[in-house]
Design a protein with these regions (language model features):
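Local sequence-structure signature of Cys/Sec-based thiol-disulfide redox active-site neighborhoods
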Residues: 205-229
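Long, C-terminal-biased catalytic regions of enzyme "large/alpha" subunits
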Residues: 1-202
Length: 230
């Protein structure tokens, strides 16, 4: 969350990219720099570290410990999707694969046009390679889909199953391990009002040609091997 730590993370990732490039030339194999999901180890490692090193810093001090995955922001950092994107856009393009920005929403967007507008703004103004729109929803055995996190069905009062994305896929929150469950409780979601705030995002919108055509994105050097140049 701090500028110094973001710069340190950039230096570390660039160093790892350079080392991987050296290894590819040395061994003739291909290597990836990935932000692995760590849906189990982010809790397991934190739990064991707390036993052996009680003073170690983890997420959610004083309760169920867990680690924030890879170079993601702390889950409770902000409710402003563009503030989060500004930080992650410095880091996620440095991975060569296996990275994603999850746009966690408290509930689904009002319609497909709102979703399309958000997707377009991210695509046109940021370089990160992958991102998702990840609303939370609930399922009632009798009434089916319910928008947002609703522990009890508003129609019949029956207990529901709350679903959210755990790393790359949706699962019932009740089946998550203790660390991921704590992460879900700590998570700030990006509110619809902030996502739809045109004034907030206005200065991020680049000018786009109205004519139909193709856009080719290139990099100065090959991200996987410095021996190959465009």
């Amino acid at each position: 969350t701090h500028e110094e730590t973001q710069e340190f993370a950039v230096r570390v990732l660039n160093h790892m990219r350079e080392r991987l490039s050296d290894y590819q030339e040395q061994y003739g194999d291909l290597y990836n720099l990935e932000a692995t999901p760590a849906e189990s180890t982010s809790y397991r490692l934190a739990k064991h570290d707390k036993v052996h090193f009680p003073d170690i810093i983890t997420a959610h001090e004083g309760a169920t410990p867990y680690y924030t995955n890879s170079s993601h922001l702390p889950v409770g950092y902000t409710e402003d999707v563009f503030a989060a994107l500004d930080v992650q856009d410095k880091l996620q393009p440095l991975y060569t694969s296996g990275t994603v920005f999850h746009t966690f929403l408290g509930e689904k967007l009002p319609d497909w046009k709102a979703a399309a507008a958000l997707v377009r703004k991210i695509a046109e103004n940021y370089e990160l390679p992958y991102y998702t729109l990840s609303p939370t929803y609930s399922i009632c055995a009798d009434h089916g889909y319910l928008a947002g996190e609703q522990a009890v069905c508003p129609h019949c009062g029956r207990k529901t199953e709350v679903y959210s994305r755990i790393t790359g896929y949706y699962r019932p929150v009740q089946n998550w391990n203790d660390g991921k469950s704590q992460e879900f409780r700590d998570r700030k979601t990006y509110h619809i009002g902030e996502i739809k705030n045109e004034a907030k995002a206005e200065n991020k919108i680049s000018s786009v040609c109205d004519a139909d055509g193709y856009i080719l994105y290139t990099t100065a050097t090959c991200p996987n091997c410095r021996a190959v140049k465009p």
